[in-house]
Amino acid sequence: MHNQSPIIRRKSTRIYVGNVPIGDGAPIAVQSMTNTRTTDVEATVNQIKALERVGVDIVRVSVPTMDAAEAFKLIKQQVNVPLVADIHFDYRIALQVAEYGVDCLRINPGNIGNESRIRSVVDCARDKNIPIRIGVNGGSLEKDIQEKYGEPTPEALLESAMRHVDILDRLNFDQFKVSVKASDVFLAVQSYRLLAARIDQPLHLGITEAGGARSGSVKSAIGLGLLLSEGIGDTLRISLAADPVEEVKVGFDILKSLRIRARGINFIACPTCSRQEFDVIGTVNALEQRLEDIITPMDISIIGCVVNGPGEALVSTLGVTGGHKKSGFYEDGVRQKERFDNEQMIDQLEAKIRAKASMMDESNRIAVNLLEK
């Protein structure tokens, strides 16, 4: 039941991606990106809906062609989450998706043509209240910057970002956020630190091309964890060579671990040893799968013996401490008379968690109604 995060977040300006507030103290938004062919409307819509079910706040969709732009129009009509169109080189695509209700444009102003083309996109974004994300990547720096620095460095990524920021500044456009992603953790972290000291706009965090589900999650947790612990970051994406749904789950787990944004259950479980009185690993794995639909913030401790179990249970919403044949049960840190049969642990604990979540949700609804009165 540790609710308050000690992290003091960096002050940033406020923008909106659709109805999602970004920056200026708003909850850190979790983003993902589709990996389907955008022209395959059905597959893309299905993937976005799967992302919606696990709580994604914003979804980015690559729009490389005019055919993809036409598909984007149909996709936008069938989903509820705000969509970001990822566009490079052809400014006309940006203008087209703006007509189709895009919620944010991910462009680099410097690579979509001459100043008149940049101005036309920015003017369109301003007229339609569409924010822009400047997305700098260590693997695609401008040729002159590559030649100047020889390799991607934090200073190189900063210079690239500021080049695009300056373009928007000259056009008096301030509704934008910026990212400076790299696949190397140290490079990305230092680049974001430099950028955070230079601008007030919201920052979108990510370790790009982080790797597969396991290695990429570890890299992202380290890199983003460092930045978030320093108060840097307003949106994030976990870039994995895996199902995008996993990106969202890992993103929320990172925020949950830092007590920045709670969504769903935070399981506290021991790694097990010969003292365990029930199958801790099997119990945790089963409950994680069964309870994915629970979004109520809760700390659930599942400890196999009495060495650490009671202590963890004291600071948990619900807790189980392993005992011989039957295990002790705690609610809000208080030991209950009821004990769980170790063989029926999973079903019994699932029922208790669901009941507690419903009760907490109802209490929150009552509190909100009282405040509104």
Curated annotation (Swiss-Prot):
SUPFAM superfamilies of this UniProt entry? Enolase C-terminal domain-like, Nitrite and sulphite reductase 4Fe-4S domain-like
**Keywords of this entry:** 4Fe-4S, Iron, Iron-sulfur, Isoprene biosynthesis, Metal-binding, Oxidoreductase
* Pathway linked to the protein: Isoprenoid biosynthesis; isopentenyl diphosphate biosynthesis via DXP pathway; isopentenyl diphosphate from 1-deoxy-D-xylulose 5-phosphate: step 5/6
Q: Give the protein name, as stated in the record.
A: 4-hydroxy-3-methylbut-2-en-1-yl diphosphate synthase (flavodoxin)
Annotated residues for binding of [4Fe-4S] cluster:
270, 273, 305, 312
**Molecular function (Gene Ontology), one example:** 4-hydroxy-3-methylbut-2-en-1-yl diphosphate synthase activity (ferredoxin)
Q: Which NCBIfam families match?
A: ispG_gcpE, PRK00366.1
Q: Which reaction does it catalyse?
A: (2E)-4-hydroxy-3-methylbut-2-enyl diphosphate + oxidized [flavodoxin] + H2O + 2 H(+) = 2-C-methyl-D-erythritol 2,4-cyclic diphosphate + reduced [flavodoxin]
Name of the gene this protein is made from = ispG
What PANTHER family does UniProt report for this protein, alphabetically?
A: 4-HYDROXY-3-METHYLBUT-2-EN-1-YL DIPHOSPHATE SYNTHASE, 4-HYDROXY-3-METHYLBUT-2-EN-1-YL DIPHOSPHATE SYNTHASE (FERREDOXIN), CHLOROPLASTIC
**InterPro entries in the cross-refs:** Dihydropteroate_synth-like_sf (IPR011005), Enolase-like_C_sf (IPR036849), IspG_bac (IPR016425), IspG_bac-typ (IPR004588), NO2/SO3_Rdtase_4Fe4S_sf (IPR045854)
Q: Which organism is it from?
A: Serratia proteamaculans (strain 568)
Give me the comment on cofactor binding.
Answer: Binds 1 [4Fe-4S] cluster.
Q: Does the keyword NADP apply?
A: no
**Function per UniProt:** Converts 2C-methyl-D-erythritol 2,4-cyclodiphosphate (ME-2,4cPP) into 1-hydroxy-2-methyl-2-(E)-butenyl 4-diphosphate.
Query: What Enzyme Commission number does this protein have?
Result: 1.17.7.3
Q: Which cofactor does it need?
A: [4Fe-4S] cluster
Family, according to the entry, reads as follows: Belongs to the IspG family.
Kindly list the biological process annotations in GO that this record carries: isopentenyl diphosphate biosynthetic process, methylerythritol 4-phosphate pathway; terpenoid biosynthetic process
